[in-house]
Amino acid sequence: MMKNLNGRAHNACYHPYLHQLHQAQQLQHQQQQQQQQQQQTQLQQTPHAAHTQQNGLTQNAQPQIQWPYNSSAAANQYYQQQQQQQQQEQQMLRQRQLPTQQPAASYEQQQQQPQQHQHLQQQQQQHQLRQTFTNAATNTNAAAMAAMCQMQNFFTQQQQQQQQQEFNNNCVHINYNQQQQQQPTAAVATTTPTQKATPTKTTPTNNPTTTTNNSTTTTTTNGDKFAMDASEIASFLASELFMQQLGTFDGIQSAPTLTTPTLTPTTLRSIEETFFEMTNDAPYQAGFKPPPLAPLVNNNNNNNGNGNGNGNGNGNVLASSVVPTTTTTATIIGVSNPLISQQQQQQQQQVFDCGASVMPGSDTEESNGSWADGQMNEDQSISDTSSGATDSTSYQNGHMMGNSGGGNGGGTGGANNFSNVLAAAGRNTNTSNSATPARRGGGRRPNRSANMTPEEEEKRRIRRERNKQAAARCRKRRVDQTNELTEEVELLEKRGENLKKEMELLNETKNQLEYFLQAHRPTCQKVRADMLSVTTCNGLIGPPALLSAGSCGSGSSHHNNNSNSNDSSSGTITGLDATLNSTGRSNSPLDLKPVPIDEDLLLHIKDEPLDGALDSSSSLDQDGPPPHKRFALPNIATLMTPTGPAGSLQTPVSGTAPHGFGSFPTTISNISNISSIHNGPTLNSLNKMPKERPNTLAFQRPFGGQMQLSGSGRAPTQIQGVPIQTPSTGTFNFDSLMDGGTGLTPVSGPLIPNCTSQNKHPLELPTPTTEPSKLVSL
């Protein structure tokens, strides 16, 4: 039993084949020795006598080319060619040996000892011949070389073909090898170097004689030796593939096929199918799979396959016992032998078919036909259909397995059986196409209709028709539903695409509008309301307005100052004058209630000096409205401050007004008190708290010269017609300073402001509080 196809491990069945090879090699060497002795005896004769003898044998040769009679150099060249040819034959035979068994190796060593002795004798004889024939002409030597080359090429081709056929056929007779080797050497011995074109025409005629001994109908010549039919080509390729696969033992290739691929189970199966398609007609071609056939067994196995030298190990024991054949080579059904012609194979096939029909223990054609008819009737009533190609292939494989398996029990005469190895490889590697029927997954179990009445068959037919119609309706409904869903999906996709396009258009429009707004903003004449609004608390400016006022420009504020308004309900002051350089005064009259002041408590105060840094051309001097747009306060005795929910302020009012507030110290604490007033308690509660005031004010008198002119020695009671009423008992807070309730502002007469009485900036305004540490002294 073989373990693999690479030839690494093989069975002892190869031993007979090795012995046959050694015997053939020994006989060949003996024949070569005899031929050399004959050649030596012929060379002792004169070349003229040899030439006359050869002319008597070959009178029909072409007389165009003549050889010289005394051509010693040609004879020497001829024997050199023969020696080289013999050495090549010996090398090829050594390569075809299988040195894997130790007994075979020892036997080979025993056979090589006489071969070496013969080789030494041949070399000595050649040396003597070279010394005798050394005086040859140059032209005769060239002609002899050409003739010898042609002869050598032809003989090497013939010998290679014969040796390859000998190795492919495992049980070839030794007599066949002797005939094939004797005839070319005999032609060499009888042919002298006096002809050039004669060997190419005479020697091929000997080749058909060798092949007709084995196959009586095969005739091959040099012209049609490549004319092969389909079966011969298939068999040749199969044998080449198989021998290359099995002949590789430790780097030694038996068959020199360098272009053939590796033998695989797929190639084996395809080769088997090709053999059966071309050479064997299957008895059953109905398209279904028959049951596995029993192996063919013959009672004459012991007579034909009992391990003799020519024994058969195949499954065609019946054919070998019925038909007398001239050769005993392996002829399995579907495996063509290169030594047997196609007609002889057809005859054997016909006889084998006839014998198979009467073979005891095998299925006859009638029984198989009846079984096939019954199977067809059953399959007609069953809706299950099978593949004809697969079933026929599996049937052919199973048929071959049966034939090859039957021959294995006959004997072990055929050592290296090609068909048996193919069958074993196909059986081991191909499990899907085995002889057992493969079960198909799913489906209904076939019901046999043999025991059914016609009524039951009609009911089954009607039921199957209904099932078919229901299945068709189900398929149609499924297709319709699929189409509806597909259409709905397409509509939704289109709607989504439209929405995406609309979104893109809207985004483009938005981007364009934003670009237009950004481009129009620097040139727009309208001002946004959020940029002009100022947060107020009870008529007071809040911290956000103060912080934003410093960042806004005041270049054009004096042009639109008349549009300012104090909206105490909303808490914002709107207008273009965002800096509020007009100190937040409103155009409405102030409602202030005067408080009676004791004149005895008035102290002398110094006049406030004018701010020299401010002139009439400065921008801070002209923060207020122009003179022609200014108007005086109404002459009323009581002024009410619009403080909203905080109530009115009880601020004492004086008849004199200060010249300006530019000298008030400005601190960050005073500015931060604005936010505390905004978020702290109301102003009325702050005004009721007790406060401390200084008795004097650290101010310079602006009009000291006029006051010195008064000779009375007392301080003047008025300055430029404005009476001085100091000190006042009122509380000076932010509202009183902004609205004029300082006690120095006359309420009886009109108030005519001048440039020095305006504020420089809201940030410079003091913010007196009720805290003792933050009192403001005037």
UniProtKB/Swiss-Prot annotation:
Protein name in UniProt: Transcription factor kayak
Family per record: Belongs to the bZIP family. Fos subfamily.
SMART domains: BRLZ
Major location category of this protein: nucleus
Residue intervals of the bZIP domain: 457-520
Gene Ontology CC: nucleus
Job of this protein: Developmentally regulated transcription factor AP-1 binds and recognizes the enhancer DNA sequence: 5'-TGA[CG]TCA-3'. May play a role in the function or determination of a particular subset of cells in the developing embryo. It is able to carry out its function either independently of or in conjunction with Jra.
Zinc-finger keyword on record: no
Region (Leucine-zipper): 485-513
Span list, region Basic motif: 459-478
Region (Disordered): 24-57, 76-130, 183-223, 294-320, 356-414, 427-478, 550-594, 756-778
InterPro entries: AP-1, bZIP, bZIP_sf
Entry keywords, A to Z: Activator, DNA-binding, Nucleus, Phosphoprotein, Transcription, Transcription regulation
One term of GO molecular function: RNA polymerase II cis-regulatory region sequence-specific DNA binding
Biased composition, class Low complexity, residue ranges: 24-54, 77-98, 109-130, 183-222, 382-402, 550-571
Subcellular location: Nucleus
Polar residues composition-biased segments: 99-108, 427-436, 579-589
Assembly notes: Homodimer. Heterodimer with Jra. The kay-Jra heterodimer binds more stably to the AP-1 site than either of the two proteins alone.
Disulfide cross-links: none
PTM annotation (Phosphoserine): residues: S588
Composition-biased stretches (Gly residues): 403-414
